[in-house]
């Protein structure tokens, strides 16, 4: 399960700049004994202290030294988890992954013996929904930054509270700089008689050891700059409830003038200016205003569409120009920026909320809370004195809300409700009851809407007792690490026979930053980059978002076809080479990054996409829906097979409009970048792009229709194939509705208010219609009435097995045989011989020949004592391979990984070696038609990511089906699965070799053949 959205930022990194040697001077150190005592005495403790006081790094260590391990610490964001874990491990002279570990997303750096574990709130939530109380096998759980009210954080809090009722030994520590103490005390007061939330306040440090922060408001800024005392141009309205939040040109000019004023008055060029603006567009506006001053300023951008870690890494202290950082609220508490002396706060923020009229998430500009403003103030005054400029009047500021509304009150909660209903723990699997117990319960109507929608798409069903229970489809959706809409899209692509294309599109829908580089402030250049990968924008339906999504889809395929396939081939060549190029392996990451830069794509984004892709695919292999059995994994990047790309590299001026700091400091000439000019990188309609784009547009329209309840829908409606058909009636004239149609009786549209309005083409697109209920066009989704419910959209694979699928793979002509790989006791070979001529069976075993007697195998050629992969697939140097590979048409391996290795990593290595050596044999001898059938437990197949291992050696999954144990031998590798609707059974996976193009990579087969037969 995955409820959390993929973000890569930090919140507790605010305390990170302190080196280990400075820990002794932290304000929290004097409170060590008191903190330990209070946590021992109380089940819930709230620790309140200013940013930088040492809460995040020191409290876990206090508890460890008091023998209270294991200890779990949560952070709201991934970057913070890694950063704090590294700092704590370093301070304890411990290797990360040993005593101190962490878990973010798919990355686990920990052992069973780890004593302090750092995780995101989303990871902990997933574990609680998956394992219930068993996920909390810790002595203490620390929930850090509880003031950051994400949906995940609020759900973690309510789940932990429910489990506290069941486990009296559990200790919970809440930590924050700005938490509302009274609210948390009230929230936990029902734990038990005589229990209460104990509050430990960390005193502020000695004033001599901290730097001063001066706060100025709009009226003071106006005085400094000598502008008009009429402040309405910058803050139109006396209070937040009436004032417009729009960032007007006058405010941008004021910010610009303030930056120049600070630069003029501050002699220390190393002191930076941080500007908070709410949107990408407002960042762009200020960026363009600063362009004429790039000789004086080095401008950096912090926005979620830009890789935050790379942006921070680029922020070196510049001694010749002042650093100006333009940032959204990602910089409030997510990052630590060195040498920030000035903060300019627009006091606006972009808020995501559920728009019921558009039936999708939307955004709006809002005034920040005073708590948010304090977080922004905390960005300065750490290493030097700081000044904060709040661009609202002081009286206005005092009327701002104290805290921002929690996310749980602003979203549709569809995905969260589904995940709650999927958990097995009765304490937390009733969505209505659990959400009503949240610190800020959402509107019951919102929860009911979510439940109704999940019922309508048959992700949930109602039990006879009225409980909401997940269907197979619902559990499958909840298992993906994707957003709700992306999860539905993936399944629908699977039903169309394009599962892997759908997974890639679904992952890209949820990914920021996307792989194709978006030069900040230069949208035309970005669209040029997009056009290099997808030129079908004029032939597909949908808007800009669909076009950009398809371009990134093609960019990923291009990376796989041109770069990854090349290095997969190099790996195979190196495998048998006597002189292995060790430097190539070490240099590979840099080579790949350079290649990506040549083609305006981001290496880090590709790896993020790949990780989510494999995780989503693994869920399908665990659940095995009906359509997976015939799902062919041959990638679309092999269409056309003749695809060819040759890089032509030219030096071009850097797209950065300012010089890099190191170039200026060292008096270097203006930087140039090397780019591939062999464009377009992907020709029109390569990789089946247009067909996939049309399918995507159609599926998005269907999803929008499904998830939009019709006013006349009684719960028994089914979608019309064309939901905008007007049944011969002319639609209403939208100009008539607006009062300015000048065609009168000549108009071909109807001028009556009773007529049907034409459909809004934007409403059914991925971005939706921005006009909501005020749109002149219709947002109604037509349905036809039926007297029955349609069948469930996604059913599990049928349990029955048959001999036919496997026997159909065996050669039927007089020539050709099958090879049973490493059948130690001939168990499977004997069973196959009962169904297939024994004289056409080859069988190998790593066991030595014994007194083996089976009359059914009298004509079978058995090769004893052959080890894997050498001897069986490829013989050692100077030895002839005993297997007559020219006769083999099908290779079968009945694999129990535990019989080969005792750890998953070693088992992966066994499988990797198998596919690599098979690829060398089949490519070198041009035996492309040989099929490889791997039979193993599907859960192990998923956990070991076997499909990925095969793909790295050009083997692609063609089909899969249940193993017929009665006909072909009982399979010993069984895994007991406790979770409902998950499958655990032996499956036969059929892999086909798809050789890479010799047009793209030259005559590689002769090199492999030479290596193969010269050994």
Curated annotation (Swiss-Prot):
A zinc finger (C3H1-type) spans 727-753, 754-782. GO terms for molecular function: ATP binding; ATP hydrolysis activity; DNA binding; mRNA binding; RNA helicase activity; zinc ion binding. A motif (DEVH box) lies at residues 144-147. It comes from Arabidopsis thaliana. This is DExH-box ATP-dependent RNA helicase DExH8. Belongs to the DExH box helicase family. The keyword Membrane does not apply. Residues 254-419 form the Helicase C-terminal domain. SMART domains: DEXDc (SM00487), HELICc (SM00490), ZnF_C3H1 (SM00356). Residues 36-197 form the Helicase ATP-binding domain. Keywords: ATP-binding, DNA-binding, Helicase, Hydrolase, Metal-binding, Nucleotide-binding, Repeat, RNA-binding, Zinc, Zinc-finger. It is an enzyme of class 3 (hydrolase). Pfam families: DEAD, Helicase_C. It catalyses: ATP + H2O = ADP + phosphate + H(+). ATP binds at residues 49-56. Gene3D superfamilies: 1.20.120.1080, P-loop containing nucleotide triphosphate hydrolases (3.40.50.300), Zinc finger, CCCH-type (4.10.1000.10). Its EC number is 3.6.4.13, 3.6.4.12.
